Amino acid sequence: MAVRRFGQVIGIKPENIEEYEDLHANAWPTIIKIIKDANISNYSIFRYQNLLFAYFEYSGSDYEADMAKLAAEPEMQRWWKISDAMQWQVPEAKAGEWWHVISENFHVD
């Protein structure tokens, strides 16, 4: 199974940057497990001013099913309730999209 790479962008409210970074520096072990169980690896979030850029790799065979399972986890819903309140959608976000998926333009292994 080929690894799929994803890039995403979202805004971060300036007044929540410190809290957001602290939350992720101390990510709950259950959240890490849920992410790994969804076949996600090499997951990073970067910040540039008031924008967050996420990168991750997906190695499963059914992305939609794995993301639905991840989203159904009560602990993930609790995490999102906290972190989503600190974020804002970029204008380019499509309907139903929180983190806006961006295209890959270059890759070297």
Give, region by region, the residue ranges found by the protein language model.
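Active-site-flanking beta-strand signature of metal-NTP-handling nucleotidyl enzymes
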Residues: 6-11
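Short amphipathic alpha-helical segments
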Residues: 16-41
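Intrinsically disordered, low-complexity acidic/polar segments
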Residues: 17, 54, 63-65
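Short, glycine- and small/hydrophobic-rich beta-strand elements in well-ordered beta-sheets
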Residues: 32-53, 57-61
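An amphipathic, aromatic/His-enriched active-site/gating alpha helix that lines ligand/cofactor pockets
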Residues: 38, 59-97
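Eukaryote-biased recognition of C-terminal alpha-helical segments
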Residues: 100-106
